[in-house]
Amino acid sequence: LKKDGKLPNGLIAPFKQLPVLDVDGKIFAQTGAIARFCGKLSGLYPKNNEFEAAQIDQIIEAAQDINYLVTLSGRDKEKDRLALARKILATKHLPKWFQFLENLLAENKDSNFFVGNKISIADLAIWRLLGWLSSGLLDGVPTNILEPYEKINRLREEVYKHPKVNEWMLKTYGKKI
């Protein structure tokens, strides 16, 4: 993406930022919009069930809220203030949000997924976010931060089992799960 918002094919990114998706010369921007578009095409987002769509949307927006908290916690580059911000994130904010997610998973008695009995874009969004949060890449966020959350860990296992996820992991990271 060039500074003026042009993509390599000459089209303009609507907000002059990534991500964008080019479908036959039509450009879509914003992670949620792209996820819903692809989700509808792939069966990971409901086409005709507005209730399930709203349930999925609330999870995606929760992931955005969590991501925002992580971003805020990393803004201060002064070492001691950054460490304090990350400590608050890891001991206060993230556990609160993880419990919200745990409660939503408990409400779905049909499966280990957030909505219905099959994987959706909500599950994928949380799976990737949780992978990052527990990766050790974020100073001050322990890699075992998810240990207390049984349902979240079951969700992660279910997502890891999906053949397309394994295919993506192999292609992206050179390893299967």
Which residues does each predicted region cover?
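Residue-level recognition of oxygen-bearing side chains
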Residues: 33, 151, 164
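C-terminal helix/juxtamembrane-tail motif
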Residues: 158-177
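GST superfamily/GST-like fold recognition
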Residues: 56, 114-141, 147-153, 159, ...
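Short amphipathic alpha-helical interaction/hinge segments
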Residues: 67-74, 132, 137, 167
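GST-like domain detector, emphasizing the conserved glutathione-binding G-site
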Residues: 1-98, 107-109, 118
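Extended, charge-enriched "interface" segments that sit outside catalytic cores
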Residues: 104
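Alpha-helical packing segments of well-folded alpha/beta enzyme cores
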Residues: 93-100, 129, 152-155
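Acidic, serine/threonine/proline-rich low-complexity intrinsically disordered regions
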Residues: 80-88, 138-147
